[in-house]
Amino acid sequence: MSLAEQIEQQQGDAGWSAHLQLRFVQRGDVTRLGAWKHFGPLLVQRPFYPEGSPCHVYVLHPPGGIVAGDRLELNIHLEPGSHALLTMPGASKFYRSIGPTARLTQRFHLAAGSTLEWLPQDSIFFSGARASLASRFSLEPGARLLAWETLCLGRPVMHERFDHGTLDSLLHIELPDEVGLHERLRIAGGHLDKLGGHPLLATFCAAPADQAVLEQVRSLLDELGNPAGATLLGSLLVIRLLDHDNQHLQRTLQRLWHVLRPAILGLPACPPRIWAT
Protein backbone atom coordinates (compact mmCIF):
# COMPACT_ATOMS: atom_id res chain seq x y z
CA MET A 1 0.00 0.00 0.00
CA SER A 2 1.33 3.44 -0.93
CA LEU A 3 1.91 6.20 1.64
CA ALA A 4 -0.96 8.21 0.15
CA GLU A 5 -3.36 5.27 0.53
CA GLN A 6 -2.28 4.75 4.14
CA ILE A 7 -2.89 8.43 4.87
CA GLU A 8 -6.37 8.40 3.34
CA GLN A 9 -7.30 5.37 5.45
CA GLN A 10 -6.74 7.50 8.56
CA GLN A 11 -9.91 9.54 7.93
CA GLY A 12 -11.59 7.97 10.95
CA ASP A 13 -8.55 8.50 13.17
CA ALA A 14 -8.56 11.44 15.56
CA GLY A 15 -4.83 11.94 14.93
CA TRP A 16 -2.10 12.37 17.49
CA SER A 17 -0.73 15.23 19.57
CA ALA A 18 2.80 16.52 19.99
CA HIS A 19 4.18 19.51 21.80
CA LEU A 20 7.57 21.07 22.43
CA GLN A 21 8.41 23.74 25.00
CA LEU A 22 11.76 25.52 25.02
CA ARG A 23 13.06 28.15 27.43
CA PHE A 24 16.24 30.09 26.68
CA VAL A 25 18.18 31.86 29.42
CA GLN A 26 21.23 34.12 29.41
CA ARG A 27 24.03 32.76 31.59
CA GLY A 28 27.04 35.02 31.61
CA ASP A 29 27.86 35.86 28.01
CA VAL A 30 26.11 32.82 26.51
CA THR A 31 22.48 31.87 25.89
CA ARG A 32 21.63 28.39 27.12
CA LEU A 33 18.67 26.11 26.56
CA GLY A 34 17.59 26.33 30.18
CA ALA A 35 14.63 23.97 30.07
CA TRP A 36 12.72 21.94 27.56
CA LYS A 37 9.84 19.49 27.54
CA HIS A 38 8.43 17.48 24.72
CA PHE A 39 5.72 14.98 23.99
CA GLY A 40 5.55 13.09 20.73
CA PRO A 41 7.84 13.54 17.71
CA LEU A 42 8.62 17.25 18.16
CA LEU A 43 12.28 17.38 19.18
CA VAL A 44 15.40 19.53 19.16
CA GLN A 45 18.99 18.67 18.39
CA ARG A 46 21.92 19.62 20.58
CA PRO A 47 22.44 23.42 20.58
CA PHE A 48 25.26 24.88 18.48
CA TYR A 49 27.43 27.94 19.21
CA PRO A 50 29.09 28.86 15.91
CA GLU A 51 29.33 32.56 16.82
CA GLY A 52 29.78 32.61 20.59
CA SER A 53 26.82 33.91 22.58
CA PRO A 54 23.73 33.19 20.41
CA CYS A 55 22.26 29.70 20.74
CA HIS A 56 21.53 27.92 17.43
CA VAL A 57 18.91 25.17 17.69
CA TYR A 58 17.38 22.84 15.09
CA VAL A 59 13.72 21.95 15.59
CA LEU A 60 12.72 18.55 14.23
CA HIS A 61 9.18 18.08 12.95
CA PRO A 62 7.66 14.62 12.45
CA PRO A 63 9.61 12.96 9.61
CA GLY A 64 6.47 11.28 8.32
CA GLY A 65 4.58 14.54 7.92
CA ILE A 66 1.35 15.85 9.42
CA VAL A 67 -1.99 14.23 8.63
CA ALA A 68 -5.68 14.39 9.52
CA GLY A 69 -6.44 15.37 13.09
CA ASP A 70 -2.81 15.81 14.15
CA ARG A 71 -2.21 18.61 16.65
CA LEU A 72 1.27 20.06 17.07
CA GLU A 73 2.18 22.82 19.52
CA LEU A 74 5.45 24.69 19.76
CA ASN A 75 6.04 27.07 22.69
CA ILE A 76 9.23 29.12 22.80
CA HIS A 77 10.13 31.46 25.68
CA LEU A 78 13.18 33.71 25.71
CA GLU A 79 14.28 35.11 29.07
CA PRO A 80 15.64 38.69 29.30
CA GLY A 81 18.81 39.24 27.31
CA SER A 82 18.86 35.81 25.67
CA HIS A 83 19.41 35.24 21.94
CA ALA A 84 18.22 32.14 20.08
CA LEU A 85 18.33 31.25 16.40
CA LEU A 86 15.94 28.44 15.48
CA THR A 87 15.67 26.68 12.15
CA MET A 88 14.74 23.26 10.76
CA PRO A 89 16.59 20.70 8.66
CA GLY A 90 13.49 19.97 6.57
CA ALA A 91 10.08 21.20 5.53
CA SER A 92 6.85 20.65 7.46
CA LYS A 93 4.60 18.51 5.25
CA PHE A 94 0.81 18.52 5.51
CA TYR A 95 -0.53 15.53 3.56
CA ARG A 96 -3.90 15.27 1.88
CA SER A 97 -6.78 14.09 4.00
CA ILE A 98 -10.54 13.80 4.09
CA GLY A 99 -10.47 13.59 7.88
CA PRO A 100 -10.26 16.29 10.58
CA THR A 101 -8.14 19.39 10.16
CA ALA A 102 -4.44 19.07 11.00
CA ARG A 103 -3.30 21.90 13.30
CA LEU A 104 0.08 23.45 14.00
CA THR A 105 0.19 26.16 16.69
CA GLN A 106 3.39 28.10 17.39
CA ARG A 107 3.80 30.60 20.24
CA PHE A 108 6.86 32.73 20.88
CA HIS A 109 7.37 35.03 23.88
CA LEU A 110 10.31 37.42 23.85
CA ALA A 111 11.10 38.93 27.26
CA ALA A 112 12.70 42.36 27.58
CA GLY A 113 15.96 42.69 25.70
CA SER A 114 15.84 39.20 24.16
CA THR A 115 16.41 38.31 20.52
CA LEU A 116 14.72 35.63 18.41
CA GLU A 117 15.62 34.55 14.90
CA TRP A 118 12.93 32.15 13.65
CA LEU A 119 14.07 30.86 10.25
CA PRO A 120 12.18 27.62 9.49
CA GLN A 121 11.96 25.70 6.27
CA ASP A 122 8.74 25.99 4.31
CA SER A 123 5.41 24.43 5.21
CA ILE A 124 4.25 22.29 2.27
CA PHE A 125 0.52 21.69 1.87
CA PHE A 126 -0.19 18.78 -0.43
CA SER A 127 -3.24 19.00 -2.64
CA GLY A 128 -6.23 17.89 -0.59
CA ALA A 129 -4.69 18.88 2.74
CA ARG A 130 -6.90 20.34 5.45
CA ALA A 131 -4.63 22.44 7.61
CA SER A 132 -4.59 25.19 10.21
CA LEU A 133 -1.38 27.09 10.97
CA ALA A 134 -1.20 29.74 13.70
CA SER A 135 1.97 31.63 14.65
CA ARG A 136 1.91 34.16 17.51
CA PHE A 137 4.80 36.36 18.63
CA SER A 138 4.72 38.52 21.77
CA LEU A 139 7.53 41.04 22.29
CA GLU A 140 8.33 42.91 25.49
CA PRO A 141 10.20 46.26 25.44
CA GLY A 142 13.64 46.04 23.89
CA ALA A 143 13.06 42.63 22.30
CA ARG A 144 14.25 42.05 18.74
CA LEU A 145 12.77 39.75 16.12
CA LEU A 146 13.75 38.34 12.75
CA ALA A 147 11.16 35.79 11.64
CA TRP A 148 9.95 34.37 8.37
CA GLU A 149 7.21 32.00 7.33
CA THR A 150 6.88 30.26 3.97
CA LEU A 151 3.70 28.62 2.69
CA CYS A 152 3.99 26.23 -0.27
CA LEU A 153 0.63 25.24 -1.75
CA GLY A 154 1.05 22.05 -3.70
CA ARG A 155 4.43 20.83 -4.91
CA PRO A 156 5.55 23.14 -7.72
CA VAL A 157 8.82 21.26 -8.20
CA MET A 158 6.75 18.15 -9.04
CA HIS A 159 4.26 20.20 -11.10
CA GLU A 160 1.55 19.27 -8.58
CA ARG A 161 -1.02 21.99 -8.00
CA PHE A 162 -3.01 22.68 -4.86
CA ASP A 163 -6.22 22.06 -6.77
CA HIS A 164 -8.32 21.17 -3.73
CA GLY A 165 -8.03 21.40 0.03
CA THR A 166 -8.17 24.12 2.69
CA LEU A 167 -5.65 26.23 4.58
CA ASP A 168 -6.34 28.64 7.43
CA SER A 169 -3.18 30.57 8.30
CA LEU A 170 -2.84 33.14 11.11
CA LEU A 171 0.14 35.39 11.82
CA HIS A 172 0.00 37.59 14.93
CA ILE A 173 2.78 39.84 16.23
CA GLU A 174 2.21 41.80 19.42
CA LEU A 175 4.51 44.74 20.14
CA PRO A 176 4.66 46.94 23.26
CA ASP A 177 2.62 50.13 22.79
CA GLU A 178 2.15 49.48 19.05
CA VAL A 179 -0.50 47.99 16.82
CA GLY A 180 1.70 45.16 15.59
CA LEU A 181 0.34 42.72 13.01
CA HIS A 182 -2.68 40.45 12.83
CA GLU A 183 -3.43 38.86 9.49
CA ARG A 184 -5.28 35.79 8.33
CA LEU A 185 -5.16 33.93 5.03
CA ARG A 186 -7.82 31.42 4.07
CA ILE A 187 -7.45 29.27 0.97
CA ALA A 188 -10.27 26.91 0.02
CA GLY A 189 -11.07 24.75 -2.96
CA GLY A 190 -7.61 25.15 -4.43
CA HIS A 191 -8.26 28.77 -5.44
CA LEU A 192 -5.00 30.75 -5.41
CA ASP A 193 -6.52 34.00 -6.69
CA LYS A 194 -5.51 35.76 -3.46
CA LEU A 195 -1.90 34.97 -4.34
CA GLY A 196 -2.18 35.88 -7.99
CA GLY A 197 -1.89 32.22 -8.89
CA HIS A 198 1.49 31.85 -7.16
CA PRO A 199 1.88 28.65 -5.11
CA LEU A 200 4.50 30.14 -2.78
CA LEU A 201 4.05 32.94 -0.26
CA ALA A 202 6.66 34.13 2.24
CA THR A 203 6.35 36.72 4.98
CA PHE A 204 9.47 38.11 6.67
CA CYS A 205 9.01 40.27 9.78
CA ALA A 206 11.70 42.29 11.53
CA ALA A 207 11.61 44.53 14.59
CA PRO A 208 12.60 47.12 15.53
CA ALA A 209 13.11 48.66 12.10
CA ASP A 210 13.08 52.21 10.75
CA GLN A 211 12.75 54.06 7.46
CA ALA A 212 16.41 53.54 6.57
CA VAL A 213 16.05 49.77 6.91
CA LEU A 214 12.85 49.87 4.86
CA GLU A 215 14.62 51.68 2.01
CA GLN A 216 17.51 49.22 2.16
CA VAL A 217 15.12 46.29 1.83
CA ARG A 218 13.14 47.91 -0.97
CA SER A 219 16.33 48.40 -2.95
CA LEU A 220 16.99 44.68 -2.72
CA LEU A 221 13.41 43.80 -3.66
CA ASP A 222 13.61 46.01 -6.75
CA GLU A 223 16.16 43.56 -8.15
CA LEU A 224 13.70 40.67 -8.02
CA GLY A 225 11.60 39.56 -10.94
CA ASN A 226 8.80 38.32 -8.70
CA PRO A 227 6.05 40.23 -6.88
CA ALA A 228 7.36 41.56 -3.57
CA GLY A 229 6.70 44.42 -1.20
CA ALA A 230 7.81 45.86 2.13
CA THR A 231 5.83 47.92 4.64
CA LEU A 232 6.77 49.61 7.90
CA LEU A 233 4.07 49.34 10.59
CA GLY A 234 5.43 51.47 13.40
CA SER A 235 8.70 49.70 14.20
CA LEU A 236 7.65 46.42 12.54
CA LEU A 237 8.97 45.74 9.05
CA VAL A 238 6.77 43.35 7.06
CA ILE A 239 8.07 41.89 3.79
CA ARG A 240 5.90 39.75 1.52
CA LEU A 241 7.12 37.65 -1.39
CA LEU A 242 5.37 35.56 -4.04
CA ASP A 243 7.12 32.97 -6.17
CA HIS A 244 6.81 29.85 -8.30
CA ASP A 245 10.23 28.43 -7.36
CA ASN A 246 10.93 27.38 -3.78
CA GLN A 247 14.72 27.40 -4.11
CA HIS A 248 14.63 30.92 -5.54
CA LEU A 249 12.36 32.02 -2.71
CA GLN A 250 14.63 30.51 -0.05
CA ARG A 251 17.65 32.25 -1.57
CA THR A 252 15.75 35.55 -1.49
CA LEU A 253 14.85 35.10 2.17
CA GLN A 254 18.46 34.35 3.02
CA ARG A 255 19.62 37.44 1.11
CA LEU A 256 17.18 39.54 3.11
CA TRP A 257 18.40 37.98 6.34
CA HIS A 258 22.00 38.85 5.42
CA VAL A 259 20.87 42.48 5.12
CA LEU A 260 18.56 42.61 8.13
CA ARG A 261 20.74 40.85 10.68
CA PRO A 262 23.42 43.56 10.75
CA ALA A 263 20.80 46.31 10.44
CA ILE A 264 18.48 45.07 13.22
CA LEU A 265 20.77 43.05 15.49
CA GLY A 266 24.13 44.70 14.84
CA LEU A 267 25.65 41.29 14.12
CA PRO A 268 27.28 39.90 10.97
CA ALA A 269 25.47 37.09 9.21
CA CYS A 270 26.32 33.63 10.57
CA PRO A 271 24.23 31.20 8.50
CA PRO A 272 23.09 27.96 10.15
CA ARG A 273 25.25 25.08 9.00
CA ILE A 274 22.21 23.22 7.73
CA TRP A 275 21.77 25.84 5.00
CA ALA A 276 24.96 24.62 3.35
CA THR A 277 23.72 21.02 2.98
UniProtKB/Swiss-Prot annotation:
Record keyword Chaperone present: yes
What protein family does this chain belong to? Belongs to the UreD family.
Gene name tied to this protein: ureD
Quaternary structure and partners: UreD, UreF and UreG form a complex that acts as a GTP-hydrolysis-dependent molecular chaperone, activating the urease apoprotein by helping to assemble the nickel containing metallocenter of UreC. The UreE protein probably delivers the nickel.
Provide one Gene Ontology cellular component: cytoplasm
Instruction: Provide the alphabetized UniProt keywords.
Output: Chaperone, Cytoplasm, Nickel insertion
Name the HAMAP family on file: UreD
Indicate what this protein is called per its UniProt record: Urease accessory protein UreD
Out of the domains of life, which is the source?
A: Bacteria
| Transit peptide among keywords | no
| GO function terms (MF aspect) | nickel cation binding
Its taxonomic path starts at: Bacteria, Pseudomonadati, Pseudomonadota, Gammaproteobacteria, Pseudomonadales
Per the record, a Pfam family? Answer: UreD
Q: Where is the signal peptide?
A: none
